[in-house]
């Protein structure tokens, strides 16, 4: 094959692993990636919801997995590489809001569960992705962690969730630093008030609790627009990295959450 023929070959599609792909931002992002030509590995605990996200696409691979279980995570990434040969992007999206209430009312079980999903699960998936990204040829890849506005400023009575999202920020920075020699980048998207079931559950239909003790219905924006921001980060050239991106609904309370 001559050089001219090689230069006109179409590069293979990129492969992305998306956790929490059965609903909300994860589902919207998976569909955006599929529309953009990615091969997408859909991970989550509920297979039926993952299949609904995939909608029969031949470029989608459904892998039911609990990101808090190390063996599930290893199986997820082995399945991704087995099906598509490599991992170019990980969107660490799965998370839980956890319990609400004053920290003195927070049980150790609820605290540990929130950390297990939002921090340990994120770490386990990143670690598995990095191992494969180091080993593959060409080496490298991109990790995008889903943080939150709570990584900047908390909602009232959300100590566990807020602590985990600050931890994700630290993890993002460490992964990005340590990945440099291997062509692995890591960035974080902090999304405020995308219209998802998680957002709808805040306040139990009575509006979100504000810093002054009142409740108010807050602005929201479509999950598909959040997904477009994730796709923007994932589509950056290998020479660039979007380290941090904050995307909120226009008019959403931010500083002091009031």
Locate the predicted segments by residue.
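The beta1-alpha1 cofactor-binding region of Rossmann-like NAD(H)/NADP(H)-dependent oxidoreductases
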Residues: 65-76, 108
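Substrate-binding pocket helix/loop in short-chain dehydrogenase/reductase
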Residues: 101-103, 110-112
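C-terminal helical subdomain
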Residues: 184, 188-189, 208-255
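Conserved glycine-rich cofactor-binding loop
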Residues: 22-24
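Residue(s) in the substrate-gating loop at a strand-loop-helix junction
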Residues: 148
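Conserved glycine-rich Rossmann-like NAD(P)H-binding loop of the short-chain dehydrogenase/reductase
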Residues: 36-51
């Amino acid at each position: 094959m001559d050089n001219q023929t090689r230069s006109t070959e179409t590069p293979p599609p990129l492969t992305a692993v998306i956790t929490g792909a059965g609903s909300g931002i994860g589902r919207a992002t998976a569909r955006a990636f599929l529309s953009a030509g990615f091969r997408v590995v859909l991970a989550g605990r509920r297979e039926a919801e993952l299949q609904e996200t995939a909608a029969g696409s031949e470029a989608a691979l459904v892998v039911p997995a609990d990101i808090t279980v190390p063996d599930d995570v290893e199986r997820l990434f082995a399945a991704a590489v087995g099906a598509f040969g490599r991992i170019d992007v990980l969107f660490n999206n799965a998370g839980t809001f956890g319990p609400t209430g004053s920290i003195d009312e927070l049980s150790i079980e609820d605290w540990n569960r929130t950390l297990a999903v939002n921090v340990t699960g994120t770490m386990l998936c990143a670690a598995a992705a990095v191992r494969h990204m180091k080993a593959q040829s060409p080496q490298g890849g991109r990790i995008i962690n889903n943080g939150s506005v709570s990584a900047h400023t908390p909602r009232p009575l959300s100590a566990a969730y807020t602590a985990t999202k600050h931890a994700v920020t630290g993890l993002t920075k460490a992964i990005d630093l340590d990945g440099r020699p291997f062509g692995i980048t890591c960035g974080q998207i902090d999304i405020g008030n995308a219209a998802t079931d998680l957002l709808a559950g805040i306040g139990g239909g009575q509006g979100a609790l504000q810093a002054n003790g009142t409740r108010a219905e807050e602005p929201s924006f479509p999950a598909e627009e959040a997904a477009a921001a994730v796709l923007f980060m994932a589509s950056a050239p290998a020479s660039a990295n979007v380290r941090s991106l904050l995307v909120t609904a226009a008019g959403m309370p931010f500083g002091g959450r009031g």
